[in-house]
Amino acid sequence: MPRYLGLMSGTSLDGMDIVLIEQGDRTTLLASHYLPMPAGLREDILALCVPGPDEIARAAEVEQRWVALAAQGVRELLLQQQMSPDEVRAIGSHGQTIRHEPARHFTVQIGNPALLAELTGIDVVADFRRRDVAAGGQGAPLVPAFHQALFGDDDTSRAVLNIGGFSNVSLLSPGKPVRGFDCGPGNVLMDAWIHHQRGEHFDRDGAWAASGQVNHALLASLLADEFFAARGPKSTGRERFNLPWLQEHLARHPALPAADIQATLLELSARSISESLLDAQPDCEEVLVCGGGAFNTALMKRLAMLMPEARVASTDEYGIPPAWMEGMAFAWLAHRFLERLPGNCPDVTGALGPRTLGALYPA
């Protein structure tokens, strides 16, 4: 059976996930590898997410470094598995999103797939999102089709919740097309706030948030953003939810303890997820969580409290480690492309119809 590699570097910018799958009737995870994002590269990518000078040259330089990291990760995983490049049919590379503005009909991921193919000796399938945008879609989320393939074959009303920098949900109802949308900020604001206040990259187990108290006036102000009231299809990114956005809201309120702000940001993530999910799928019986948020103990407990009628659990219970779900999805999307099969869900993204996503860069 063919083997594929998937590369994922998400909006949290903590590092790069490299996964190896085998694709038959089912998708099987064979191996995984992780490379932390170098601090300088992370900061330079973040700087590209907002308007600035000399963007074209800076983006070209940054993506050379991003590709070098990706190629290193591929080589290390293959070495660990004692495999050669010709044993891999293709790499599915998401690239690194630096702008996502579907309302303006564009999304931009850097990642120079031609150079990645050259450095690894493996065919690369990349540029998945723009095909959906070209068909009138949001270009995100793209993982619901993969979630459907993994978890949509029984009679359970189920949601698969990915909590990365942003949160998105796939709604799997028996006998119905898969639906899904972005819920809002996942970890992105909590990560930004703890880094701003304490120099840490994330709130381990949600412990700092758990030490504070939710400020309901601030929470109401944050939830008043029009994104939360919008119905799907919808997607979002750092262009909308970022540290300056939070600071604008904080300026309208009396000074608050930093831990209380973190607690309020965790509640924002939990509420935006639970309210949008239950509004769209009130009969949901099970919520399977993947992404970095699955490791945030405080957030998982809060989600379970807000959705008492549904069982909230990690995808680990089904043999899919939550950290590797998105990497697996883009390996699977590479397979879909090479077989000329659709990879999007029109009811999720709003595209005019099913489309084969991606473009091929031969080695």
From Swiss-Prot:
A GO MF label: phosphotransferase activity, alcohol group as acceptor
Consequences of knocking out this gene: Cells lacking this gene accumulate anhMurNAc. Deletion of this gene increases fosfomycin sensitivity. Growth rate is not affected.
Reactions accelerated catalytically: 1,6-anhydro-N-acetyl-beta-muramate + ATP + H2O = N-acetyl-D-muramate 6-phosphate + ADP + H(+)
Keywords: Antibiotic resistance, ATP-binding, Carbohydrate metabolism, Kinase, Nucleotide-binding, Transferase
EC id: 2.7.1.170
CDD domains linked to this entry: ASKHA_NBD_ANMK
Alphabetical list of InterPro entries matching this protein: Anhydro_N_Ac-Mur_kinase, ATPase_NBD
Binding site for ATP: G10, T11, S12, L13, D14, G15, M16, D17
Pathway(s) this gene product operates in, as recorded in its UniProt entry: Amino-sugar metabolism; 1,6-anhydro-N-acetylmuramate degradation; Cell wall biogenesis; peptidoglycan recycling
GO biological process entries: 1,6-anhydro-N-acetyl-beta-muramic acid catabolic process; amino sugar metabolic process; peptidoglycan turnover; response to antibiotic
Signal sequence coordinates: none
Free-text function comment from the UniProt entry: Catalyzes the specific phosphorylation of 1,6-anhydro-N-acetylmuramic acid (anhMurNAc) with the simultaneous cleavage of the 1,6-anhydro ring, generating MurNAc-6-P. Is required for the utilization of anhMurNAc either imported from the medium or derived from its own cell wall murein, and thus plays a role in cell wall recycling. Contributes to intrinsic fosfomycin resistance in P.aeruginosa.
Stored HAMAP family: AnhMurNAc_kinase (MF_01270)
Protein family membership: Belongs to the anhydro-N-acetylmuramic acid kinase family.
Protein name (database record): Anhydro-N-acetylmuramic acid kinase
Species this chain originates from: Pseudomonas aeruginosa (strain ATCC 15692 / DSM 22644 / CIP 104116 / JCM 14847 / LMG 12228 / 1C / PRS 101 / PAO1)
Gene: anmK
